[in-house]
Amino acid sequence: MNNILSEEVLNVTDFTTSRQLALWKREDLQSPQLDDVAEEVPVALVYNGISHVVMMASPKDLTHFAMGFSLSEGIIDSPREIYGMDVVPSCNGLEVQIDLSSRRFMGLKARRRALAGRTGCGVCGVEQLNDIGKPVQPLPFSQTFNLGNLDRALKHLNDFQPTGKLTGCTHAAAWVMPSGELAGGHEDVGRHVALDKLLGRRATEGEEWRQGAALVSSRASYEMVQKSAMCGVEILFAVSAATTLAVDVAERCNLTLVGFCKPGRATIYTHPQRLIAD
């Protein structure tokens, strides 16, 4: 297995496909011309030789995705419990082959169920609706964020969406430092996958990534709140709205949830005590 921080083995340098498409502009159906379309491929996460889940995703940053998914789904508690990863082609997509510690693999097998994911779905494969909510330890109140610094982050969020700029087809998730500077970010055709990539990246970065908040370009679903809380993220900013279940989960696990983030304004759903307004 490769070191978990090494480059992925696939030489994937282009995450769009050019296709002949007809364009309509003000009652004029133009001749087909080349346009960019985002790639979306099945990605299987395979733990110690056993396929656990297949998600539809953009074919990049997949080791970060696998790390973030493993943490946010409670498969592992620490990056040290994954000994290595390889990304390899499979018949119709890609596999991330994960070398998981024996103790964690036994736990995974004990709870394993048929789980087939798809973009934007957090319930797929869950046997009982009561199993949707995962037990999450209430978050501490150790973080604060000055809302006056949010504008800077919003201005640069699309810097982490190069494929999105070409296709208009990706979501972004970025880590916002207390200063408003973006430490890093990831994009994907699936908003949950983009967040998992960010959470996986954060888990393997240095101490500077412990301070700050997550920012997503999409709405905030209950699953995104739950994933953030599972990884110790205390503040989640979303460009769009939050759902009722997301608000309920955020309230219960002490996560500060903020939606409709625009320059100079935002809607604070839960736990505003972490936020400073200049």
From Swiss-Prot:
Annotated Mo-bis(molybdopterin guanine dinucleotide) binding sites: F260, C261, K262, P263, G264, R265
Gene3D superfamilies found in the cross-reference section: 3.10.20.10, Cytidine Deaminase, domain 2
InterPro entries (UniProt xref): Cytidine_deaminase-like, FdhD
Localization in the cell: Cytoplasm
Pfam families: FdhD-NarQ
One annotated GO molecular function: sulfurtransferase activity
Catalytic site positions: C121
Example of a GO cellular component annotation carried by this entry: cytoplasm
Function: Required for formate dehydrogenase (FDH) activity. Acts as a sulfur carrier protein that transfers sulfur from IscS to the molybdenum cofactor prior to its insertion into FDH.
Name of the protein this chain belongs to: Sulfur carrier protein FdhD
Upper lineage: Bacteria, Pseudomonadati, Pseudomonadota, Gammaproteobacteria, Enterobacterales
